[in-house]
Amino acid sequence: MNDTFVRSGPLKELSSYPHWAQRLVQECETSRLAVVGHPLYARMRDGQLSRQTMRAFLIGGWQVVEQFPLYMSHNLLKTRFGRSPGEDMARRWLMRNIRVELNHADYWVRWAEAYGVTLAELKAQLVPAELHALGHWCWHSCATEELALAMAATNY
């Protein structure tokens, strides 16, 4: 992907982005809705998940939450200041957002504690292998893909 990335308007307005980025968002919309509209999240919101299911979710999700700043650091290593305006934007955003992401591990630990999950249990990761798939995919994407693809894979 060699198209220059230049945002031309507000951050949260899709029309501010290059056509290839707009196409990416449009082509992913069905998949995005399938995830955000998944019954798991509605049941979680409504307090309808069993304690056992919540514990598995919290333990299985820990890997991604704890390592997310590391995925982002892989992408940061791909940037160099002044190579392109888009790369400069990505570099600045990554540096700022890594700091924000660091807090999420603390929040996750507190949430897990509310369900009786200890930090030792989070670290042990004794959950079904399927709960590790997202973490492996994020790590692989950021370690092997070019900047634009890796950032799209983990930050959209």
Please place each PLM-identified region on the residue numbering.
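Generic structural signal of hydrophobic/aromatic residues within well-ordered alpha-helices
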Residues: W20-L24, C28-S31, L40, M72, ...
